[in-house]
């Protein structure tokens, strides 16, 4: 699933191409998945924002077109065999590429996210000033859940998913199975720094393109952070720090990659 770095990369690439353009039409054949998109048509794009894993096209007249990329969605500048919707602008068309069809588009009045409840409960953006250590530490101390499960929750840090939770926990040398409230202040600071560092590096490199090639930047180029993955997707390969094979187990229903030596064996 595209996470914060992939969605932020998409936002940065699309913004200069669409700002000031009029969204003439949203073309699709699935009104259940792409809801109320007619509300966005005929309006000029004023800004392209991001919250967590959501893209928000701010349109004139107090309207937003909200995009959630799902498991495999993304915007492309050229059509693909998996194009599910198209945003027709004045000078170009953006194609919504989504092989597994979990992506969504919503036309809404600005800030009215009743149809998108996840947007209403997102925590702070981990690369913003609002993501301060005291609140992060308090959130850890208030939860008995495993660290990996809490990081995926979106209320502690918006936009963190499987890839970057695993990578941040490895960099902080913390077990994904540890109860969050068991962390000392020093351990929590390590995780706080690691999370910000990993996400910032991934944004700088355009996100991660995995072996399924489902995520690519709008121009079709792959991301580059996958070359820096220490544990994610590396089951059985040597840990870059100690050489022990990386292991994969399930936490909160999600495959989790970690080094038993550097991070602890777990249950």
UniProtKB/Swiss-Prot annotation:
GO terms for biological process: base-excision repair. Gene3D superfamilies: 1.10.8.50, MutM-like, N-terminal. DNA binds at residues 82, 100. The active site is at residues 2-3, 53, 254. A zinc finger (FPG-type) spans 230-264. Its cofactor is Zn(2+). Signal peptide: none annotated. Keywords: DNA damage, DNA repair, DNA-binding, Glycosidase, Hydrolase, Lyase, Metal-binding, Multifunctional enzyme, Zinc, Zinc-finger. InterPro entries: DNA_glyclase/AP_lyase_DNA-bd, DNA_glyclase_Znf_dom_DNA_BS, Formamido-pyr_DNA_Glyclase, FPG_cat, MutM-like_N-ter, Ribosomal_uS13-like_H2TH, Znf_DNA_glyclase/AP_lyase, Znf_FPG/IleRS. Its EC number is 3.2.2.23, 4.2.99.18. It catalyses: Hydrolysis of DNA containing ring-opened 7-methylguanine residues, releasing 2,6-diamino-4-hydroxy-5-(N-methyl)formamidopyrimidine; 2'-deoxyribonucleotide-(2'-deoxyribose 5'-phosphate)-2'-deoxyribonucleotide-DNA = a 3'-end 2'-deoxyribonucleotide-(2,3-dehydro-2,3-deoxyribose 5'-phosphate)-DNA + a 5'-end 5'-phospho-2'-deoxyribonucleoside-DNA + H(+). It holds the Pfam family zf-FPG_IleRS. GO terms for molecular function: 8-oxo-7,8-dihydroguanine DNA N-glycosylase activity; class I DNA-(apurinic or apyrimidinic site) endonuclease activity; damaged DNA binding; zinc ion binding. It comes from the Bacteria. Binds 1 zinc ion per subunit. PANTHER family: FORMAMIDOPYRIMIDINE-DNA GLYCOSYLASE. Involved in base excision repair of DNA damaged by oxidation or by mutagenic agents. Acts as a DNA glycosylase that recognizes and removes damaged bases. Has a preference for oxidized purines, such as 7,8-dihydro-8-oxoguanine (8-oxoG). Has AP (apurinic/apyrimidinic) lyase activity and introduces nicks in the DNA strand. Cleaves the DNA backbone by beta-delta elimination to generate a single-strand break at the site of the removed base with both 3'- and 5'-phosphates. Belongs to the FPG family. Monomer. This is Formamidopyrimidine-DNA glycosylase. It comes from Thermus thermophilus (strain ATCC 27634 / DSM 579 / HB8). The gene is mutM.
